[in-house]
Design a protein with these regions (language model features):
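Ligand-binding pocket segment of bilobal, Venus flytrap-like solute-binding proteins
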Residues: 1-38
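Extracytoplasmic/secreted envelope proteins and their assembly/folding machinery
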Residues: 3-4, 19, 45, 64-68, ...
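A near-ubiquitous, low-amplitude feature marking generic local secondary-structure context
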Residues: 5-8, 31, 50, 63, ...
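Sec/Tat-exported extracytoplasmic proteins
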Residues: 7, 19, 25-29, 52, ...
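Solvent-exposed, acidic/flexible segments
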Residues: 8, 15, 38-41, 57-64, ...
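Periplasmic-binding protein-like
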Residues: 29-61
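Extracellular/periplasmic juxtamembrane helices and adjacent flexible linkers that interface
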Residues: 55-135
Length: 135
């Protein structure tokens, strides 16, 4: 990963990273890195789901759903925050205001017109992605 290349191998001068990776890099190598966070960023929330067919075949439907529900519990949100993942629970996020910038303006996909608009504008042939990479 890019984080590994910079942090462990010393390759590169600047890294754009997930928030938690930046915090972990600073924690693992105090004084070696500086985090410069933008005032505006994109709220990226990778999806989590139970894959019904797989869970049914393995007989793990109940425990899978319990785990999924637990991820959003107060206890799990605190564990996430302690590992530098931004909690989705606002009250718990505020408990970790010494770690997370509560004033950062976080944009969602809706702020960019939704997935269909983003796909068309940025990733379709001739879109922003192609122009950046000279395609």
């Amino acid at each position: 990963s890019a984080t590994t290349s910079l942090v462990e191998n010393g390759q590169g001068d600047v890294l754009i990273a997930w928030e938690n990776e930046a915090f972990l890099s600073v924690k693992d190598d105090p004084g070696e890195f500086e985090i410069i966070a933008p005032s505006i960023s994109v709220l990226a929330q990778p999806s989590v789901a139970v894959v019904d067919e797989v869970a049914e075949n393995r007989g793990t439907e109940e425990v899978s759903r319990e785990y999924l529900n637990y991820l959003y519990s107060d206890d799990a949100q605190r564990i996430a925050a302690e590992n530098y993942y931004r909690p989705v629970n606002q009250e718990i996020l505020e408990e970790y205001s010494d770690v997370f910038d509560l004033n950062m303006e976080l944009k969602t996909i809706d702020d960019f017109g939704g997935w269909q608009e983003v796909q068309w504008k940025h990733f379709a042939d001739g879109g922003v992605f192609d122009r950046i990479y000279g395609n």
